[in-house]
Amino acid sequence: MTVIVLSGPIGAGKSSLTGILSKYLGTKPFYESVDDNPVLPLFYADPKKYAFLLQVYFLNTRFHSIKNALTQDNNVLDRSIYEDALFFQMNADIGRATSEEVDTYYELLHNMMGELDRMPKKNPDLLVHINVSYDTMIKRIKKRGRPYEQLSYDSTLEDYYKRLLRYYKPWYEKYDYSPKMVIDGDKYDFMSSEADREIVLDQIVDKLKEVGKLPMDWDKSTDIQIEA
């Protein structure tokens, strides 16, 4: 059985690819809930006040998601606990968290990762990272249409988004919980183009074959013309 986790910045297309990939492989998608997150709008309205609360909220939900996914062992997750510290550390670096909040956050994360390490299946089987440029990121954020994510909502978001993209390169290089691969989200518009979608799916299947984690009962005849 196979557990795949996705990563990538806001607007990269993680949720769309999660749905496409889970249907293609016949596995269960795990989506991070955003629209009913009570803290996220508060964070965008007052980032310094709510950065710690938001990250603890996400950390808790991501912990439960990865535990369930590793237990069921047949899933695709659109974001995971392995990516969590990237966001909090970035907010801490720009003064949105106190030293006490930083210490508390990392203690919580350490305890949760320790619990995962005691599970029968400890890690995912593959990380699929979607790499996008700033322009692609903003284009998809506009298309998604969440008001509090738009540049017009807050003039500081441009710097925040550009900084976030810079944090991803070292994070990906250091990630070592599983095999990993990169999808070029600028080159392949898997959300709108069926041809690009097929290329991306083929890339992921090839990687799963390489690491010996392609589901044994997978049928390549599965229709990939999925509405993302």
Swiss-Prot record:
EC number: 2.7.1.113
Active site: 78
Binding locations of ATP: 8-16
One CC-aspect GO term: cytoplasm
Domain of life: Bacteria
Pfam family, one: dNK
GO molecular function, one term: deoxyguanosine kinase activity
Binding residue positions for substrate: 32, 44, 55, 79, 84, 149
Keywords from the named record: ATP-binding, Kinase, Nucleotide-binding, Transferase
UniProt catalytic activity: 2'-deoxyguanosine + ATP = dGMP + ADP + H(+)
Transmembrane segments: none
Self-association and partners: Heterodimer of a deoxyadenosine (DAK) and a deoxyguanosine kinase (DGK).
Similarity-based family: Belongs to the DCK/DGK family.
Function: DGK/DAK plays an essential role in generating the deoxyribonucleotide precursors, dGTP and dATP, for DNA metabolism.
Protein name per UniProt: Deoxyguanosine kinase
Organism: Lactobacillus acidophilus (strain ATCC 700396 / NCK56 / N2 / NCFM)
Taxonomic path: Bacteria, Bacillati, Bacillota, Bacilli, Lactobacillales
